[in-house]
């Protein structure tokens, strides 16, 4: 028979009482009233904060955007097909954040910073809020260093500086993405980290861009954030902020970064969809009232850090699509007013074979020559004015039959200047090559050539300079000025090449 020992039992009870930990955990919960179209209405969640992450029973995460008197409007970061009416939801007490680290370089990720390239997990010890506040006035300095795009038309006439925000705007199929990707390709060896954000694009287009980067060795310094057309609107809306958070991580570590948002029209459309489903009042073009704030808080995060913060920079190139060249629509005017200038791509120029199809007349950089090296200022100072005058003359010359010699010469020079601005895709030029090309055109060396021969001559001239006059490149790179010695070297090269070119053409 088992004997009950009272002392042993009392010891066990005493031990259990001592070990008893009365931990009370308060969880802010609610119940799903309605779910559909990527939106859930929740009853409860009384203590939830605006922008707080909430977790559904089956694991889907959402963001509380609408805090109303009797329910909470939540946008889902997933399809939410398994969420049922009456299931429970709990507030996490966190705001959307992503892990950040150097390991993200060379990877393709989604808006939640999860890899989608099938190359395994990404290790990261730090995290950043997706919606970080933009740097204040004191922590910035004015833009003064050039960010070379490798495109003559931009670097000579619409220069972009490190820390600037320059809008690329144009109709569909006018080469907007090509300008942006060429700029990324040109950052090779420049110690610039690039982030390419694809919003609501076809998966095939994103794959094509990634393949180009891989083939040209640009993925080593690039992160691609992609939310394709079949992604939920919430993730398309978040993708640019995720890209900005990654770029900021490097900027605050005293590095230079370049971020491309391709494109913000689709982000605005995703936000409009979310807002209308949340029953927020629509405004102009059915966009919600805070669509300006959507883009301003994103683009204000691009900055040139002050010397106290290590002079890092984040340059933003947002892309906006127009409908049949209408720059006065709601989203284009908003983004034009936020950015420090715009590059306008024209469908007419593109169809006329002028590529990149940059309309120099209405494109502008509000930073201007502060973002150019001295050599480029010396050589390209007058070219924008000359081209603008040429465009005006050309329009006038269509109606006039007999033109005087000076006008004919000006038209001939303008046509050759326009020809030298043409460039193949994925073929960025160094600063020295650009300077030699512009100098040749603006000083009349191309006037004696037929228009069809201009590009061939310039390609051969650049090759000749590289092989026979390497000092030219060295002078430009080291002094950043167009010295007399550099000019002499260039003049000799042009004359030598012109003689060789003439002989070739005669054969």
From Swiss-Prot:
Keywords: ATP synthesis, ATP-binding, CF(1), Chloroplast, Hydrogen ion transport, Ion transport, Membrane, Nucleotide-binding, Plastid, Thylakoid, Translocase, Transport
GO MF, one example: ATP binding
Site for Required for activity, residues: 363
Gene Ontology CC terms, in alphabetical order: chloroplast thylakoid membrane; proton-transporting ATP synthase complex
Gene Ontology process terms (BP): proton motive force-driven ATP synthesis
PANTHER family hit by this protein: ATP SYNTHASE SUBUNIT ALPHA, MITOCHONDRIAL
Protein's UniProt name: ATP synthase subunit alpha, chloroplastic
Lineage: Eukaryota, Viridiplantae, Streptophyta, Embryophyta, Tracheophyta
Gene name of this polypeptide: atpA
């Amino acid at each position: 028979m088992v004997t009950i020992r009272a002392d042993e039992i009392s010891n066990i009870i005493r031990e259990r009482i001592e070990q008893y930990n009365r931990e009370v955990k308060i969880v802010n919960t609610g119940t799903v009233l309605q779910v559909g179209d990527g939106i859930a209405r929740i009853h409860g969640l009384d203590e939830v904060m605006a922008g707080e992450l909430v977790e559904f029973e089956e694991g889907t995460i959402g963001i509380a955007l609408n805090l109303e008197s009797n329910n909470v409007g939540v946008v889902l970061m997933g399809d939410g097909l398994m969420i049922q009416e009456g299931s429970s939801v709990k507030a996490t007490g966190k705001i959307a954040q992503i892990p950040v680290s150097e390991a993200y370089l060379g990877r393709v990720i989604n808006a939640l910073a999860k890899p989608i390239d099938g190359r395994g997990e990404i290790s990261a010890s730090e995290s950043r809020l997706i919606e970080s506040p933009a740097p204040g006035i004191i922590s910035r300095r004015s833009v003064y260093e050039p960010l070379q795009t490798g495109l003559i038309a931009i670097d000579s006439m619409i220069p972009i500086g490190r820390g600037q925000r320059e809008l690329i705007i144009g109709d569909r199929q006018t080469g907007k993405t090509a300008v942006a990707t060429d700029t990324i390709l040109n950052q090779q060896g420049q110690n610039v980290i690039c982030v390419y954000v694809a919003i609501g694009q076809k998966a095939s287009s994103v794959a094509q861009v990634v393949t180009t980067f891989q083939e040209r060795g640009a993925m080593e310094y690039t992160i691609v954030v992609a939310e394709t057309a079949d992604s939920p609107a919430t993730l398309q809306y978040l993708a640019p902020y995720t890209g900005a958070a990654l770029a900021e991580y490097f900027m605050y570590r005293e590095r230079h970064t370049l971020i491309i948002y391709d494109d913000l029209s689709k982000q605005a459309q995703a936000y409009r969809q979310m807002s209308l489903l949340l029953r927020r009042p629509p405004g102009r073009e059915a966009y919600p009232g805070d669509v300006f704030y959507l883009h301003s808080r994103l683009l204000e995060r691009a900055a040139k850090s002050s010397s106290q913060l290590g002079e890092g920079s984040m340059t933003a190139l947002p892309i906006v699509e127009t409908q049949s060249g209408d720059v006065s629509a709601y989203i284009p005017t908003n983004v034009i007013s936020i950015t420090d200038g715009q590059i306008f791509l024209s469908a007419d120029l593109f169809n006329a074979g002028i590529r990149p199809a940059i309309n120099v007349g209405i494109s502008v950089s509000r930073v201007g020559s502060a973002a150019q090296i001295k050599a480029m200022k010396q050589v390209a100072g007058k070219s924008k004015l000359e081209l603008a005058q040429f465009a005006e003359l050309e329009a006038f010359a269509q109606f006039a039959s007999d033109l005087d010699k000076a006008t004919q010469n000006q038209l001939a020079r303008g046509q050759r200047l326009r020809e030298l601005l043409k460039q193949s895709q994925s073929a960025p030029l160094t600063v020295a090559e650009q300077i030699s090309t512009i100098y040749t055109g603006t000083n009349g060396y191309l006037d004696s050539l037929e228009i069809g021969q201009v590009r061939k001559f310039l390609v051969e001239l650049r090759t000749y300079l590289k092989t026979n006059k390497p000092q030219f490149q060295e002078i430009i790179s080291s002094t950043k000025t167009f010295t007399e010695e550099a000019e002499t070297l260039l003049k000799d090269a042009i004359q030598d090449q012109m003689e060789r070119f003439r002989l070739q053409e005669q054969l």
